[in-house]
Amino acid sequence: MQIWVDADSVPLIAKDLIIKTAERTQTMAIFVANQPIKLRKSPLLVMTVVPSGFDKADDYIVEQIQPGDLAITSDIPLANDILDKGGMVLTTRGVVYDKNNIKQKLNMRDFMDTMRGTGVLELQEMSGQKPYGDRDKKAFADGLNKLVR
């Protein structure tokens, strides 16, 4: 197993938990982004910089991931592609995406995009994502510990 991190938007707290888990379990963690992210020197931590552009990091992760690998992302279409390749998906808020819940998440995402596109939902009507807090950190740490042993 390897841990693939969609690193463009991973919170610093989650990044630190991924690093600690990778080192504790001797699991390779590959951080993928379109700009370098500072990582401490370790043979278990890899920073992969992809060219700038729409979904370049996502495409790279999907291309490289193997069945049984874990991806850390909150990107629902990326999560779907990873699941199609036999990977596992954990969000930084501790939600595990699987074949039983990903289609519902995709449908809801598409529905909300349609509502925004037609003007039914104004940007100010959407609550957006809450700040990353202690509850999120604990849920993520618990999920990570369960999936990476």
From Swiss-Prot:
Pfam families: DUF188. InterPro entries: UPF0178. Belongs to the UPF0178 family. This is UPF0178 protein Psyc_0274. The lineage of its organism: Bacteria, Pseudomonadati, Pseudomonadota, Gammaproteobacteria, Moraxellales.
